[in-house]
Amino acid sequence: MTLSSLGWDDFFAGAFQPFASENFLPARVALEHKHACVLLSARGEITATCTGRLLHETATRAALPAVGDWVAVRLRPESLASGAGVALVGDIHAVLPRRTAFTRRAVGDADAEQVLATNVDTVFLVTGLDRDFNLRRIERYLAVARASEAQPVVVLNKSDLHPDARGAEAEVRRITRTAPVVTLSAARGDGIAALAPWLVPGATVALLGSSGAGKSTLINRLLGKQRQDTGPLSHAMNKGRHTTTHRELLALPGGALVIDTPGLRELQLWGVDESAVAETFPEVAALAAECRFPDCTHQREPGCAVRAALDDGTLDPTRWASYEKLQREQAYAARRVDPVLARAERDRWKKIYQGQRARERIEGRWE
């Protein structure tokens, strides 16, 4: 196994330079446990833990090693003296800068970020063409994927379970705009070849989707063997049972790397800026640019192009509602981590409240 086959390139080589002369090895995180990581390197597989210094100096849990990360690891003396075939053990001293990162707000914690996958070139957003099919969820996944700076590809799985798979694909294409859409059946193998443009040697692809979308079945198909266990299909729910319980980096026979992730029961926004939401809803962004006032809130202002488009039917109200929801969530998440934005929001509502009180006093004088 070579570094280039693991996705190593000039970007990571440059970041590793400070460690090159200190007996460190570059390695990639393939599996993350609570207290240790399994790393892949040119020397083979390494089981490693973070040094106390790294744990102490790292500001947040999200900055510690995650699946897909490149790290600087130093082998322990017993591993340096061991011969071939002996398990290697080391210590992780640093996490190299991430080129991309797919994150979400940690479940049950409004102020914590959870890293799902890093250094990903392409994100396969897997959704099933069964009861899992949800256009609004796809919009949410697209916004988060675009914020990660990886290329999103919408994968519509279980085409054999939908009476009009091509019709469903057309619906998705209307909301994805520039993102590619691939329709396939991982169970039967139909359409798998359409994923080939993104599964090139050294490329890293992450599979993300809700529980039961068929990600494990798709990985088994790509691997050409039954490696990921899959749960039996619940005919009552028409939904596969979620079976992946951890994130893992796997090498495909053709040389690509794939990161499997557990099914996402929720995907709260984190680190998603306004541009990622706007890119997901380009028709809304284009209309907003035509409003009379640059700070138009698209509520009651005169000359609002968005309200006009909603009134005449040229803007889909379900798209607008989805845009508003994601925009509010994005703004809320930004305020949670930026005290300046939080203070500005408090000041804005203070002015609104003071204005309402002033109007009430004026109106009261005339009663």
Swiss-Prot record:
Quaternary organization: Monomer. Associates with 30S ribosomal subunit, binds 16S rRNA.
GO molecular function: GTP binding; GTPase activity; metal ion binding; rRNA binding
Record-given protein name: Small ribosomal subunit biogenesis GTPase RsgA
Enzyme class: hydrolase
Upper taxonomic lineage: Bacteria, Pseudomonadati, Verrucomicrobiota, Opitutia, Opitutales
Binding sites annotated in the UniProt record for Zn(2+): C291, C296, H298, C304
Domain CP-type G: residue ranges: 112-267
Function: One of several proteins that assist in the late maturation steps of the functional core of the 30S ribosomal subunit. Helps release RbfA from mature subunits. May play a role in the assembly of ribosomal proteins into the subunit. Circularly permuted GTPase that catalyzes slow GTP hydrolysis, GTPase activity is stimulated by the 30S ribosomal subunit.
Keywords: Cytoplasm, GTP-binding, Hydrolase, Metal-binding, Nucleotide-binding, Ribosome biogenesis, RNA-binding, rRNA-binding, Zinc
Major place of residence: cytoplasm
Species for this entry: Opitutus terrae (strain DSM 11246 / JCM 15787 / PB90-1)
